[in-house]
Amino acid sequence: MRVVLDTNVLLAAFATHGLCEAVLEQALASHQLVLSEHILDEVGRHLAGKFRMPATRAREIVRFLREQAEVVEPARVGPGTVKDSTDLPVLGTASAGACDLLVTGDAEILRLREFTGIPIVSPRECYERFAR
């Protein structure tokens, strides 16, 4: 299964652990993680800024993710799909990566339920799907 993990899921995986960490581990072990430079840049910026992680550690995490994932250029997504334009590249990543699943904790993206035929699920829903 080809899976995009949104920035918020990756941040939770590395900053707070728990469910999102388990989802990331499952994605890496049994599925193909698909990311974009947009998502990787957000992860690095927020880990070092918002989560006050040392910059060297944040860079190591981004490097690790880049090595483990297939990194794609997001497809263009028309404005108006979601209110927050910074969410458009996340949807575009799922589309460009021909993904089977987009995992996010973002309520606005979750409201879409699917995008171009790609199911959009919460980390909990993803965890349950992976457990099947």
Question: Locations of the language-model features?
Answer:
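Short, active-site-adjacent cap segments at secondary-structure transitions
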Residues: L10-L11, D41, I109-R111
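Amphipathic coiled-coil/heptad-repeat helices and related helical stalk/stem segments
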Residues: L19-C20, A58, T86-D87
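Active-site neighborhoods of divalent-metal-dependent phosphate/nucleic-acid chemistry enzymes
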Residues: E67-L102, A107
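Hydrophobic side chains within alpha-helical segments
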Residues: V9-L11, R45, V90-G92
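Acidic, PIN/NYN-like endoribonuclease modules and their adjacent C-terminal/linker elements
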Residues: L88, G97, L101, A107-R132
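Short, well-structured N-terminal submotif of metal-dependent ribonuclease cores
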Residues: M1-L35
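A secondary-structure boundary/capping signal
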Residues: D6-T7, L35-S36, G105-D106, S122-P123
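PIN-domain endoribonuclease scaffold, especially VapC-family toxins
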Residues: L24-T81
